[in-house]
Amino acid sequence: MAVDKLPLLAKLEPVSLIGLVLLSGLFFLLTATRKSDLPLVNGKRPFEFGIAKARQRYLKNAHSLITAGLEKAGAFRIVTENGTRTILSPKYADDIRSHRDLSLSAALVKEHHVNIAGFDAVKVTVTSDIIQDTVRTKLTQNLLNITEPMSEEATILLKAQWTDSTEWHDVALRPKTLGIVAQLSSRVFLGDKVCRNPDWLRLTVNYTIDSLMAAAELRLWPEMLRPIAAKFLPKCKKIRKQLEEARNIIQPVIDERRLAQQAAIKQGKPQERYHDAIQWLAENTKDRTFEPAAMQLALSTAAIHTTTDLLTQTILDLCGREELVQELREEIISVFKDGSWDKTTMYKLKLMDSVIKESQRVKPMAIAKMARCAEEDVKLSDGTIIPRGEIILVSCSKMWDANVYPDPNTFDPHRFLKLRQQGSDQESFAQLVSPSPEHMGFGFGKHACPGRFFAAAELKVALCHIIMKYDFKVAEGCNPQVLKSGMRLAADPFARIAIRRRQEEISF
């Protein structure tokens, strides 16, 4: 992505420009860190100037580069689109899972420009523990209260967007799954008054993508110049506008609730409690100041695209497996024989749990997780040194290790169900929400995805409705392929499926 920097530089006075250059040099000297001694797997080749070619090789062949690196060393460096990163073998996962000098927040600061206006949704996750506390406590504790509303929303959305047509018809899968996840998530985060607002749904979908593009745009600039560049760059201007639009949507809801609470207090009536994130954030912040719009965008950023990708991949993995789909229908019918969602429903959907976890094992969203930044020089248990300022990631290679998973490259929907049936020692490990070095779909350690319990519930609600209400198969002429870019893996964004309405045996 090329950015013309000359028009912006031309607006600076010569003296100011010289001052900025000198400040950049001083900043570099003051923050310079020791050089890593770890091998670099994709450095410059003979007659190459700069690292542009190395970045291209990374984007195209990251998986093979990391595999080759792990065969030679347990720790090595790799040139990525965001600079050089250190990749660690999964054997180090326990070393770093709670290491006090390895910081997720510091890694986010370096990657996402959190101190620049517009990136507020990332900033609130770094500078405050409100989001994490709300997800770990309020959201997880209220899963039973939010399951029925999500189910109601799924009924409304599927009827409108997937239709009741009993004739086979083709649809683009990812837009459909994105719509489901965005609306179900918004029902939980903002309640029923906002969750169907098309402007809010558009914002929640677009802000994540646009903020990532804005971050990439800024990385083309020296760090000292980025706050200035952000004032003029189109993507940065766009996310600032989106943040303001989010405020205009959310603030009236908050104001309306505040007035209703004041009226209830004045009349001596009990205040209405809401089972949504507006209520939970207010309860968790207490006397602390917070930005409601940024908090809501942060929740959406964390939830929507990751869950959408897993839902998309799971549906693609079910296509063409009619016997498996029938097994899932029978499990759903058995679990819902009394026709209600209760506290044991999600646990009882063990085959579905296994299917989702296996989809995530075969194709996670990234081939390395547990991003951390070393705030001091860190010495690992075997003496490996991670220099201060270095960003590290742990390879997910155990997810495809034949010593851990027999026939690891084969999708086995019953794999984790069979493990759970072996006994109590495997019960926890084999559940979708259980992270481990052998399955880092949700990360691992103290920063493992705190929203994984909600994601699992949301996925199961969506799949219950889709599986019971629709027949589906890959559309004729479509051959879904995993999209690979660097360490990222994405369910085919262009995949199309054929669907038709069926008569469900039970009602939710």
Curated annotation (Swiss-Prot):
EC number: 1.-.-.-
Keyword 4Fe-4S in record: no
Pfam families, per the entry: p450
PROSITE patterns attached to this UniProt entry: CYTOCHROME_P450
GO BP field: mycotoxin biosynthetic process; terpenoid biosynthetic process
Membrane topology (UniProt): Single-pass membrane protein
Pathway membership, UniProt: Secondary metabolite biosynthesis; terpenoid biosynthesis
GO cellular component, one term: membrane
Intrachain disulfide bonds: none
CDD domains associated with the record: CYP503A1-like (cd11041)
Traits of the deletion mutant: Drastically reduces the production of andrastin A.
Transmembrane segments: 12-32
Residues glycosylated per entry: N82, N145, N206
Subcellular location per the Swiss-Prot or TrEMBL entry: Membrane
InterPro entries tied to this protein: Cyt_P450, Cyt_P450_CS, Cyt_P450_E_grp-IV, Cyt_P450_sf
List of residues binding heme: C449
Function: Cytochrome P450 monooxygenase; part of the gene cluster that mediates the biosynthesis of andrastins, meroterpenoid compounds that exhibit inhibitory activity against ras farnesyltransferase, suggesting that they could be promising leads for antitumor agents. The first step of the pathway is the synthesis of 3,5-dimethylorsellinic acid (DMOA) by the polyketide synthase adrD via condensation of one acetyl-CoA starter unit with 3 malonyl-CoA units and 2 methylations. DMAO is then converted to farnesyl-DMAO by the prenyltransferase adrG.
This protein's name: Cytochrome P450 monooxygenase adrA
Organism the protein comes from: Penicillium roqueforti
